[in-house]
A protein has these predicted regions:
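N-terminal glycine-rich phosphate-binding loop for ADP-containing cofactors
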Residues: 1-529, 534-540, 553-575, 581-588, ...
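Amphipathic coiled-coil signal-relay and dimerization helices
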Residues: 549-551
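Short glycine/serine-rich donor-binding loops of glycosyltransferases
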Residues: 603
Length: 811
């Protein structure tokens, strides 16, 4: 089979979505041409150039590293259109106007390479209608590729073919989008707004309709429909503000214009409050006001009755809040039976969505799985709507929905289809089973895609009722304690690498985790090719996602502190350091599979591994200053070793300060990387470390790296000796700048003390510049500083504040 290579991509349209799609492709190291109209004044590429500059200012940041903006090449349709022939994929992302898109297609079509894929990022226009006027050959290479905003962070991409799109085109794109760009791909039918926006926007319209019926405020609704339901924290109206009220109004209009025969058509009317806000130019976050408005430090919410902004903060009824913590079946039953408006409102919005997806599944998606994944990945729900229905008791909920339809309480007078109430789905208790997910058109449960790219996903996004592998029990367990599980993937050819997964809260590291890790390494040295440290929590999507490790387990260390004071902690610190050295000098490669946060001791564990395989959305740093301490698990020691290595390579061992400054600043300022690429720029990742874009491929990639290292005769590094250090003169230089910061009141006296101890550790202590030390010397400096600081009242205040409130104390 020949390789499908994407060497360069063109993005047509440098607006909000086009520019951000281009930025994320650059994150994935795909060269991109960003096209827009030629400017009427100044440089012809001014529009695209301005868009690239604006990307640097956006929050959340579209680039993993801001400087990567230089890899985006600006272009215009007048001077650069011939460059389209260099591109293997062309993605159109201009405004949602069918006529504008057709005009652009006429202009660019003759210049698209004969084997290139042509795609549109439309959020809901008909792909078939967009392809009208194309040659049959170009139609066969055309499809919809719908990214969600913001493209870097939203996992979903919908792939929408027409009747003419060649199947291999879709397979090639799905493979590229999944593995290289890191997305979750759902194939949708060419119906208005596809799957995610069709169901997601309906759910928002249902919320607005039912909220008005029950007389609820917007902030009240958001407290009810956000994290309490396992959905995005921004809930309903805050989400609308973030998306943009004009964008939302456009998506609703697409439904109005194209779904006149839909029994739910009355719901598709633009809500009066939304229409009025758009008319006033209050488009949400981008204009400074929408359903919410920031006034000074206060967040105000729109009062629908008066049209004025009032103080926000309305909360869910306490009884209803308690109901929402009950198991799914009990929760839905209690909501339905409770008279409080909040409970009735919640039952109503659940019923409305269940009714809608039951009626429309066959027309909008191939199967129920695609609906659930689209809503989870595109709208940030922890559970898709079909999953929620199935978890609450399929048949009982279906009967309740039918009763409300018959009573005229539903939003449409249309019955649930027969497949919901009888036959295989009713018998199996839902749409997701061990065989697959229900596809109404073919009347069967269809399995997951067997596209080769999914062979790299040991664990695919699980669904309620599906027979997916459970990462907490999967494979063959070698040993398990309260702190760790060591296991192997027992499939043929996969059982040669020991996988260690932590079981502690936030995967923090205490003595019991260290013991388990050392035991796993000893086991691997006898019978296996390597060790991978991988956490099942990595499968949690979102930002920052599930943690790799939040660092040392302070709570586990507290009894030793209470009994022996600061000195009583020293054995804990020494054990942590020895554990890290055991990782570093293991006789088999230890590979850290990192995603989410890797902070403090979690970062140090990663630094001591033979190799790091890191998900692009990883947030890495030594943050101990936040609790008044210094890194003492070898993180500062590793900084000194790397600085010495760099200085030796540059023949500058008498001027090591410039090589250690970045590491000092990283630790003293508790800097955390904004991405894996940023972590590499900060020095936490080496150029040889691997960055993975799809978190579901992380474990597979890490195992392959461990095997590859073993295959070439891996040997642990020799123990560090004769390490040149920056010494007392460098410490004095750093302290001089710290004094200025302290005297200018940028840092406190205690901040000064902590930063001084970090400087002493990374510079090798009170010795002459260029003096030679060993690893144990550097570790002793860390331990001494850690124990000293732990004995101070201000550090103890910081630790207690963090343990009690989860927030740093400034003192």
């Amino acid at each position: 089979m020949s390789n499908f290579l994407i060497r360069k991509v063109a993005v047509l349209g440098a607006g909000v979505m086009g520019a951000q799609i281009a930025a994320h492709l650059v994150n994935a190291r795909v060269p991109v041409l960003l096209f827009d109209l030629p400017a009427k004044e100044g440089p012809k590429n001014a529009i695209a150039l301005k868009a690239i500059e604006n990307l640097k200012k956006l929050s959340p940041a579209p680039f993993g590293v801001k400087d990567d903006a230089k890899y985006l090449e600006a272009a215009n349709y007048e001077d650069d259109i011939a460059k389209l022939a260099e591109c293997d994929v062309v993605i159109e992302a201009i405004a949602e106007r069918m006529d504008w898109k057709h005009d652009l297609y006429k202009k660019v079509a003759p210049h698209i390479a004969p084997n290139a894929i042509f795609a549109t990022n439309t959020s809901g226009l008909s792909i078939t209608k967009l392809s009208e006027g194309f040659s049959d050959e170009l139609k066969s290479r055309f499809c919809g590729v719908h990214f969600f905003n913001p493209p870097r962070y939203m996992h979903l991409v919908e792939l929408i073919p027409t009747a003419h799109t060649r199947p291999e085109i879709l397979d090639q794109l799905e493979t590229f989008l999944t593995s290289i760009v890191g997305k979750g791909v759902v194939r949708a039918k060419d119906t208005p707004n596809f799957i995610a926006n069709r169901v997601g926007i309906f759910s928002i319209l249902a919320v607005i309709t039912e909220a008005a019926k029950f007389g609820l405020r917007f902030d009240e609704v958001d407290d009810l429909t956000g994290s309490r339901l396992g959905r995005a924290k921004s809930a309903t109206f805050r989400t609308a503000d973030v998306v943009g009220l004009d964008t939302m109004a456009h998506v609703i209009k697409t439904m109005q214009d194209n779904l006149a025969d839909d029994p739910f058509f009355p719901v598709y009317q633009t809500p009066a409050v939304l229409a009025e806000l758009v008319k006033q130019g209050a488009l949400g976050q981008k204009t400074g006001g929408g359903f919410y408005k920031k006034e000074g430090k206060a967040i105000k919410v729109l009062d629908a009755k008066t049209g004025t902004y009032v103080d926000s903060g309305a909360k869910a009824d306490e009884t209803v809040g308690r109901i929402l913590k009950r198991p799914p079946a009990e929760r839905l039953k209690l909501l339905r039976e409770t008279d409080h408006p909040h409970a009735q409102f919640l039952w109503s919005i659940f019923r409305d969505v269940f009714h809608y997806i039951g009626v429309h599944l066959e027309s909008i998606a191939d199967n129920a799985r695609d609906v659930d994944l689209a809503i989870r990945w595109g709208f940030g729900w922890n559970e898709g709507p079909f999953e929620g229905w199935q978890a609450a008791g399929w048949k009982q909920v279906a009967e309740w929905v039918q009763e409300d339809i018959a009573a005229g309480k539903a939003l449409a007078n249309v019955p649930l289809p027969s497949w919901v109430l009888e036959g295989a789905v009713a018998e199996k208790g839902g749409v997701h089973t061990a065989e697959g997910s229900w596809a109404p058109a073919s009347k069967r449960f269809v399995p997951r895609s067997d596209l080769a790219v999914y062979g790299k996903q040991v664990f695919r996004a699980p669904l309620v009722g599906e027979a997916g592998a459970d990462p907490k029990t999967y494979g063959k367990t070698l040993f398990e304690t309260d702190a760790v599980r060591a296991w192997v993937d027992d499939r043929a050819g996969e059982d040669d690498v020991v996988i260690v997964s932590f079981k502690s809260k936030m995967n923090t590291i205490g003595p019991s985790v260290i013991d388990g890790l050392v035991q796993a390494i000893e086991l691997a040295e006898k019978d296996y090719k390597g060790v991978v440290i991988w956490q099942p929590t990595s499968l949690k999507l979102g930002t920052p996602g599930g943690p790799f490790s939040a660092g040392a387990n302070l709570e586990e260390a507290m009894p030793a502190f209470m009994m022996g004071g600061a000195k009583g902690i020293e054995p804990f610190v020494k054990k942590f350091q020895e554990g890290m050295l055991r990782v570093k000098y293991a006789n088999v490669p230890v590979v850290a599979a990192v995603s989410g946060i890797a902070l403090g001791g979690g970062c140090e564990l990663m630094l001591h591994s033979a190799k790091r395989v890191v998900h692009v959305e990883s947030y890495i740093g030594l943050v101990e200053v936040g609790v008044g301490l210094v890194p003492a698990g070898g993180g500062l020691k590793e900084a000194a070793l790397r600085a010495a290595e760099a200085a030796t390579a540059a023949n500058a061992t008498t001027d090591i300060l410039k090589f250690v400054t970045k590491s000092f600043e990283n630790a003293a300022m508790a800097k955390v990387s904004s991405s894996a690429h940023d972590a590499r720029a900060m020095g936490y990742l080496k150029p040889s470390d691997t960055i993975v874009f799809n978190v579901f491929e992380l474990l597979d990639a890490a195992k392959k790296e461990a095997r590859a290292l073993a295959a070439v005769g891996y040997r642990a590094p020799l123990r560090a000796k004769d390490v040149p250090v920056a010494g007392r003169s460098a410490i004095a230089t750093i302290k001089a700048s710290l004094v200025n910061m302290r005297d200018g009141r940028f840092i406190s006296d205690h901040d000064y003390l902590i930063a001084s101890r970090i400087a002493e550790a990374v510079c090798g202590g009170d010795v002459e510049a260029g003096s030679l030390v060993d690893e144990e010397w550097l570790l002793a400096l860390e331990r001494r500083a850690f124990v000293e600081l732990l004995g101070t009242q201000k550090t103890q205040e910081r630790i207690m504040g963090m343990l009690q409130t989860g927030k740093p104390v400034r003192n």
